[in-house]
Every structure is written in structure tokens, then in C-alpha cells.
């Protein structure tokens, strides 16, 4: 089947890499399994716990990708018995067969749906993997690597060198861009160039970790991870001195000092070793630097090694949130609304209403005290804990609020002012991208071969000399010939002498 990043099935299966999408900025990667390898002791088998509930993997298997999965109620009481298998067994239990017990433990229980909580089951893509991968180093996010791959002219069948694999975000994106088939051991009828990613990493543990991820994701045949110091040893595959050239068309350097590695990215290395670049095509390069001083040194070195079309770009990616904003005293209880006077007139009307209600409340208290004859007696409280005067005043306030709010035929989703704001949390970082192009090397042999394939035309000859003439052109030439003949005849006729008058 190949890698799930390149071609996936319609439904999830046992052993697949799945991404559990909880919300826009939270995704959990997991391998779908029935049995719990970590022995957490759940009766339902392998369970993934999130802030939105528990999800046994038995509910995630054989589901269409993109499905909404409801959380389940798991048997947490069985977790206390998870270490029973490691304890010593009694002598009476040694003679009893354990196959039935093992089968009972290996078969997960049937989960029950919980009252709330859900997630979405998604198949892996480079964009989702970037949002959910474990961060080992600085991550190249989707807005950056999409623009980088576009400027590097990466296409199916290209070979790209990546120096500084890090967390593997750019690796997964680039392998999808260059993929045009898997290499096969059988000789093909028509040989074609397959896309490949040659990734180099200086840190040994990170190189081993990215190598394991590439193997788990089924990308071994398309990505070759090498642990090497590219500053000193270059970019050849295998042995640094006598290795094989990757014949790269594109280069991405995510290094602290990319200018130190440019001495190996030339057409003819001074050491006499084979060049890692493709001799039959121009090579595109991009360096990823967080400081402007690094950019200056990189550009200076690129000019020394004959790189052309040098430019620097800074990618600033912002998501714009568009929504309706409701403000006013009549928006109390509306989700996301601002209960505040939207104008001076509304604020003044509210103050006058409050003053009027206070005046009515005081007058009612005085009137009630005069009727009873004792102003110090407290009015009787009702079931709600308030006096009759307070309840009457509250009713007047609610009635006044209802009358001030003018009825509207506009639906609730269309009320308010349409506004847009930039997202508060930007998942990006400051980075400067330097792009350059190294043209193809052109020799005298190449010039002679092209001259033989496309010979130059003779000097003074017409480019349409060998083409047949059309009817219009023949008529035009015949007419021009007649005009020339008439002009020549008029020149040959001598002038007649003038007759004298007698």
C-alpha cells in the first residue's frame, strides 16, 4: 500500500497511523492497536485519554476517515489489576491451562458511549503532522515550507537535499512534493528518474529518531537520512570522500551557519570529488536563517561561488478571524456579545430609566409606610426573598426594558457589526529565507553539440526561403512586376518636339 502520507485507504485499519483532531490547534498522533503494549490495564484494550474523554482504539478502527468519534466510558477499575501478570503464581495455578485467561485478557471489552466528548479521525498529511509532531528542534511550519518548495521549483521526480532534518516537518512535505513512484527491484521498461529526499542531520539522537519515524511512516524508499557534519564532509551519499552524488536539483539549508556548507555545493569541488549537484539542470537553493547577520554572510558567500538571482524573503502568515460583534444593553445573555452601551443616547436612556425606577421605588416605600403608620416596619418578604415593593419595581424595570428594545425582523446570526481581527496566537517564528540559482555549467562541447543540432542560418538569407509561396504572395509579386514594367516603358519612350505656330 505504501506510505499513508502519499496514498491512504478509505477506512482506518489496524496498525495505521491516525491523527486525532480535538480542536483547531490540538491534534494527537497515534498508532491504532487493539492490545495495550504499555499495559495500562484498561479492559477495553488500548485507550487514548484526552481532555474531551477517553477513546478506545476499538472504536477508531474500521471507520471512514473524517468521522466524528464519540468518547467512551472505560473501565478504570481494571487498572489496579494491570500488574497481576508480573506477580508469582501459586502452585495450584501452575497445572491449570492459561490459554483461556490469555484470550480473555487479549480480547478487549465492548466500550459504552459517554454522555459528552468527541473527536475527528483524520488520515496523516504533512500539514497535520506539522501541527502534531513532537518538537525536537525549531519547526518549519506550513506557510514557510509551502513557499520554499514553490520557489525551489520542486516537482515530481526532483531530488532535494535537506541539511538539518530536526523534527522532520520539512522532510514529510518535501517527500510528497517529489513523489512520482516507488523504486522497484525489477528493471523497468522505460527508465525514469524517481523523486528522492536526501536528509542530513548533525545530531546523532535526532538523526536516529527521524530515521525511525521515516521507517514507521513507510518512506524508507524515498528518504535517505544521513548522520553527518555537512560543514566538513559535504553532501555525498555513503562515504564523504568517495560516495555517490545525489544529483540534487534543489537544496534547503536549515543550519546555524549555512555559508560554511556552500563550499561543497559547487559544480567542480576543489578536492576533485564528485559534485552533489545535477550537472544537467540549474540548481535552486534556500537557506533558513533567524538573524539578519546570518543572511548577510550567506549572501556574500553565494556571490563568491557564482550563485545568481539572490533574494531574501520574510514570510508573515496571519489568520484573519471574521465574525459579527454585537454591542448593546439589549444583548444580555447573547454568547460573545458585549453588554455595554453602544451609543451616548443608549447610555443616557439607561441612566434615566434607572433614576426613574429608583424614584418609583422610594415613592412606593413612603406610600406603604404612610399606610401602615410606621415607617420603620420592614415590608413582608415573598417566597423569592424580596418584598412586594422590590418585586413590583423589578417588574417595572423588566417591562421598561422590553418596551425599549425595538423588535427586529433581522435574524440573530445577521445582527451586529461585521469585524475581522488577526488571530491572537501565531504559530510561527521570525525567519529570513534566502533564495539563489546556480546555472547549468556550459562547456565548449555543449556549445558544439547544440550548433550541430540547430545549425545557424546563412547570412543574408531569408528565414522563409525554402517555404512555398501562397496565392496572395504570387499575385502581389505579379502586380509589382507589372508596375515596374510600365514604369520602365514610360522612361524608354522619347519626348515629342513641340510644333511651332505658322
Curated annotation (Swiss-Prot):
Describe its partners and assembly state. Answer: Heterotetramer; composed of two copies of TRM6 and two copies of TRM61.
Query: Which top-level group of life is the source organism from?
Result: Eukaryota
| Protein known as | tRNA (adenine(58)-N(1))-methyltransferase catalytic subunit trm61
Q: Which EC numbers does the record give?
A: 2.1.1.220
* Described purpose of this protein according to its UniProt entry: Catalytic subunit of tRNA (adenine-N(1)-)-methyltransferase, which catalyzes the formation of N(1)-methyladenine at position 58 (m1A58) in initiator methionyl-tRNA.
Q: Which UniProt keywords apply?
A: Methyltransferase, Nucleus, S-adenosyl-L-methionine, Transferase, tRNA processing
Q: What ranges does the record list as Low complexity composition bias?
A: 403-412
Q: Which EC class heads this enzyme's classification?
A: transferase
* Predominant place of localization: nucleus
Q: Which residues bind S-adenosyl-L-methionine?
A: 167-169, 201, 206, 229-230, 254
Which stretches does the entry tag as region Disordered?
A: 76-112, 365-417, 444-502
Per UniProt, the ranges with Basic residues bias are 79-89
Question: Where does this protein have compositionally biased stretches of type Basic and acidic residues?
Answer: 385-394, 475-494
Q: GO CC annotation: what is one?
A: nucleus
* A GO molecular-function annotation: tRNA (adenine(58)-N1)-methyltransferase activity
Record family assignment: Belongs to the class I-like SAM-binding methyltransferase superfamily. TRM61 family.
Which reaction is recorded as catalysed by this protein? adenosine(58) in tRNA + S-adenosyl-L-methionine = N(1)-methyladenosine(58) in tRNA + S-adenosyl-L-homocysteine + H(+)
Family annotation (InterPro entries): SAM-dependent_MTases_sf, TRM61_C, tRNA_MeTrfase_Gcd14
One Pfam family recorded for the sequence: GCD14
Q: Where in the cell is it found?
A: Nucleus
Q: Name one GO biological process term.
A: tRNA methylation
Please report the organism this UniProt entry assigns to the protein.
Answer: Aspergillus fumigatus (strain ATCC MYA-4609 / CBS 101355 / FGSC A1100 / Af293) (Neosartorya fumigata)
Amino acid at each position: 500500500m505504501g506510505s499513508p502520507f502519499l496514498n491512504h485507504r478509505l477506512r482506518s485499519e489496524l496498525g495505521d497511523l491516525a491523527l486525532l483532531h480535538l480542536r483547531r490547534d490540538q491534534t494527537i498522533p497515534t498508532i491504532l492497536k487493539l492490545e495495550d503494549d504499555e499495559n495500562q490495564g484498561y479492559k477495553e484494550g488500548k485507550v487514548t485519554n484526552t481532555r474531551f474523554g477517553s477513546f478506545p482504539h476499538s472504536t477508531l478502527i474500521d471507520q471512514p476517515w473524517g468521522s466524528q468519534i464519540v468518547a467512551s466510558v472505560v473501565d478504570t477499575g481494571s487498572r489496579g489489576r494491570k500488574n497481576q501478570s508480573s506477580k508469582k503464581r501459586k502452585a495450584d495455578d501452575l497445572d491449570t491451562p492459561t490459554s483461556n485467561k490469555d484470550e480473555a485478557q487479549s480480547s478487549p471489552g465492548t466500550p459504552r458511549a459517554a454522555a459528552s466528548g468527541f473527536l475527528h479521525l483524520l488520515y496523516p498529511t504533512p500539514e497535520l503532522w506539522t501541527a502534531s509532531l513532537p518538537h525536537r528542534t525549531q519547526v518549519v511550519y506550513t506557510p514557510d515550507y509551502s513557499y520554499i518548495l514553490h520557489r525551489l521549483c520542486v516537482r515530481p521526480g526532483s531530488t532535494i537535499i535537506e541539511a538539518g532534518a530536526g523534527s522532520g516537518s520539512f522532510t514529510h512535505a518535501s517527500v510528497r512534493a517529489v513523489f512520482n513512484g516507488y523504486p522497484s527491484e525489477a528493471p523497468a521498461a522505460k527508465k525514469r528518474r524517481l523523486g528522492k529526499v536526501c536528509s542530513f542531520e548533525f545530531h546523532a539522537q535526532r538523526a536516529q529518531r527521524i530515521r525511525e519515524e521515516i521507517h514507521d511512516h513507510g518512506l524508507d524508499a524515498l528518504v535517505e537520512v544521513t548522520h553527518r557534519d555537512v560543514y566538513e564532509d559535504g553532501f555525498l551519499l555513503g562515504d564523504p570522500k568517495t560516495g555517490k552524488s545525489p544529483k540534487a536539483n534543489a537544496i534547503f539549508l536549515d543550519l546555524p551557519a549555512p555559508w560554511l556548507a556552500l563550499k561543497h555545493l559547487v559544480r567542480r569541488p576543489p578536492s576533485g570529488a564528485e559534485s552533489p549537484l545535477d550537472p544537467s539542470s540549474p540548481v535552486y537553493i534556500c537557506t533558513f536563517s533567524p538573524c539578519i547577520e546570518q543572511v548577510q554572510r550567506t549572501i556574500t558567500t553565494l556571490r563568491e561561488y557564482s550563485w545568481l538571482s539572490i533574494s531574501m524573503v520574510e514570510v508573515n502568515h496571519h489568520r484573519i478571524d471574521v465574525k459579527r460583534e454585537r454591542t448593546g444593553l439589549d444583548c444580555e445573555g447573547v454568547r460573545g456579545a458585549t453588554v455595554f452601551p453602544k451609543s451616548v443616547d443608549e447610555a443616557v436612556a439607561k441612566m434615566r430609566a434607572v433614576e426613574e425606577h429608583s424614584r418609583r421605588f422610594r415613592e412606593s416605600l413612603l406610600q406603604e409606610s404612610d399606610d401602615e403608620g410606621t415607617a420603620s416596619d420592614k415590608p413582608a418578604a415573598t417566597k423569592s426573598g424580596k418584598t412586594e415593593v422590590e418585586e413590583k419595581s423589578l417588574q417595572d424595570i423588566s417591562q421598561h426594558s422590553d418596551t425599549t428594545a425595538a423588535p427586529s425582523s433581522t435574524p440573530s446570526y445577521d445582527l451586529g457589526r461585521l469585524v475581522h481581527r488577526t488571530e491572537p496566537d501565531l504559530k510561527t517564528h521570525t525567519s529570513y529565507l534566502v533564495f539563489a540559482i546556480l546555472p547549468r555549467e556550459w562547456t565548449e562541447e555543449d556549445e558544439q553539440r547544440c550548433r550541430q543540432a540547430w545549425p545557424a542560418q546563412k547570412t543574408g538569407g531569408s528565414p522563409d526561403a525554402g517555404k512555398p509561396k501562397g496565392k496572395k504572395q504570387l499575385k502581389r509579386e505579379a502586380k509589382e512586376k507589372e508596375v515596374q514594367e510600365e514604369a520602365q516603358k514610360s522612361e524608354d519612350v522619347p519626348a515629342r518636339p513641340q510644333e511651332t505656330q505658322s
